[in-house]
Amino acid sequence: MADLTKLMKGPTEAEPVQEQPKLSREEYAAQKKAEREELWTRIDALTADVFKDGSSLRGFLDFTAQCSPERIENLLLFHSDAPEATWLKTFDEWKQAGRSVRGGEVGYTALIGQDYTREDGTAASGYYVGKKFDVSQTRGRQPNRAPVYAADELVTAVFTNSPVRLAVSEAVPEGIQAQYAAQNRTIYVRNNMDAQTTFLAIAREQAAASYDIHDGRFSRAAYSAQSYCAAYVAAKKYGLDVRSFSFDRVCQMCSGLEPQEQRRFLSDVKQAAYTVERTVRRGLNEMELSATPEPACSVEVHASMEQTERPARTKKASQPQRE
């Protein structure tokens, strides 16, 4: 028989779309678990890539200096997926910050922390796999480039706001620019070095001091590599010349570690670098505040003076009201 659809005057009815079967609670949980396991496998591979050679580690540390604070797993993911990113938030976080993500933008996979309540009513923290967007994917004026500071300004900043006591000393061992002494919680700094060498030495020792939990068991040697890398991140963050750094020995030291241990190393570097950066930033802010001249008098005082000096008005006689 002939095709009956040719006899139809109107448009043919579309074939019904088959709906995806809804997953049970157990199936959904299993699917999400598989997604997490796949992501962690990728994170392990990215971790190993960082320690492949000195150049790879340098590239990751450069990204750490460039990017806003993140958990180490996200830094590894973003370094691979969004190497130009500088500041990442979730869709809702950007909304809370007063910015909106442009339509059509695709987010980057990330582990996003969340608080939740267990079945027994106790509070707990966890994470879920979600998306974050870089500031370049949002509407609005893009952030200004960070100002560039001279090395001597950075030295002044760390002296101004150091969380650890700094002391200039000629008793520092030969060949050592600065040294953290755990017994009296002091960083001893050699005098009369150039500003860049001084800053790098202090940044390295401030990073080392951040690992000291003051239990009497601190070992400076145990954190030499982490402190070295953290000083690099801080120097890179503030635009100093970092060409003298070499990371081949660090990679050799970490190459035999398990991925979790390698990430712990990178996390230690990151946290120490953030500590040094906060110290420098606060010091620079204090320097800028102290350099800003105070106005001769405030607007409120001006207004008060004008009100005081203004001649008093004579009260007009009340006018008779019309009856």
Show the residue positions of the predicted features.
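N-terminal accessory/interface modules of nucleic-acid-binding and processing proteins
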Residues: 2-323
